[in-house]
């Protein structure tokens, strides 16, 4: 789980760097921001453990959301800290590969590698796809974390397997008060 927090921090840095300027002009309209009002375009965004019920035909591996575009070949290099405060390096690369997810959606593979003193300590293939509304969905990950000299894959999950479900990585129309889940895998990623 500590490596998962590091990975999320790196991905968040990449997304926030793109999103912050866009949200600077967002304000609250005083409207309803409950989960029932979590709308983006014409789709309701997923909340908590409710199933997403996705149509694979509504998705593309071409991710051009203006708040978090993922063109093939894009790469981010970030510095993160582990729970002990030690500096780590992270490289996130949008691969020219796709994966058919268990729920039927074909997703873009994004490789995320965390390095400690130049040696990989975590490698992850994250899976993303964009719906017709422009929302970027997160479909899980195949991850390996180096723990006590051994690679641990227990953080891996895939939407459509063992009750895991997709979530939103970036809404098409982000706004203050918009709520949605990022991922769901009961007992592992909630």
Question: Would you name each region that the model predicts?
Answer:
Residues 2-13:
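Bacterial N-terminal signal peptides that target proteins for export
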Residues 21-25:
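C-terminal motif of bacterial Sec signal peptides marking the signal peptidase cleavage site
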Residues 27, 34-190:
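Conserved functional acidic sites
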């Amino acid at each position: 789980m500590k490596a998962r927090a590091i990975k999320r921090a790196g991905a968040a840095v990449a997304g926030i760097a793109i999103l912050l300027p866009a949200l600077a002009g967002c304000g609250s309209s005083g409207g309803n921001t409950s989960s029932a009002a979590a709308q983006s375009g014409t789709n309701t965004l997923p909340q908590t453990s409710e199933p997403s019920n996705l149509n694979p035909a509504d998705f593309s591996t071409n991710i051009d959301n203006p708040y978090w575009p993922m063109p093939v070949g894009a790469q981010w290099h970030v510095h993160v800290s582990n729970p002990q405060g030690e500096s780590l390096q992270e490289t996130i690369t949008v691969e020219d590969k796709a994966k058919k997810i268990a729920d039927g959606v074909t997703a873009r593979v994004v490789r995320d590698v965390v390095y400690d003193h130049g040696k990989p300590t975590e490698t992850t293939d994250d899976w993303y796809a964009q719906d017709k509304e422009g929302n970027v969905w997160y479909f899980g990950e195949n991850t390996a974390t180096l723990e006590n000299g051994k690679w641990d894959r227990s953080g891996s999950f895939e939407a459509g397997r063992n009750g895991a479900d997709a979530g939103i990585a970036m809404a098409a129309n982000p706004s203050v008060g918009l709520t949605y889940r990022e991922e769901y895998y009961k007992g592992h990623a909630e």
